Amino acid sequence: MSIPPAKRAILHVCTRETIRPLRDHVLRLKGFDVDSALTKKDALDKFWARDYDLVLIDVEGEGGIQFAEKLCSEIKSAQPEQLVAFVCNWRVANLTDCPDEIVRTEFDPAAFADGVQSIVPPPQTN
């Protein structure tokens, strides 16, 4: 009996109640273990409670940059090695320098999941 590879854990932070569960579902279908948060407080509580392979923060237009930057900075100050990515459009991507990676906002769920998977690839099996 072989032991299945560990699921990659993602903390998905998104303040949009309609989009968050859809993106969580897409990521779970791709094999990720997803915890999600609507608020900064909830995100930080979950962040401190367990280890994550990736903290994925949805940036909602230019108005969301400040929220995302503050959260990213707090996480990186506490744990510089933590991988953080923003989900955003190209314009927002040009205005930020905190995250390690950018996942472009996609209307195609498969492209979104593929973007995340390129940042946190599946574990190698022997």
Predicted regions and their residues:
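Short, polar loop motifs at secondary-structure junctions
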Residues: 17, 41, 87-93
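Short beta-strand elements of ligand-binding domains
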Residues: 58, 83-89
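Acidic, metal-coordinating helix/loop segments flanking the phosphotransfer/catalytic sites
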Residues: 38-54, 62
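Phosphate-coordination loops involved in phosphoryl transfer and adenosine-cofactor binding
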Residues: 5-9
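Conserved phosphotransfer cores of two-component systems
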Residues: 48-50, 74-82
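Output/docking surface of receiver
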Residues: 88-125
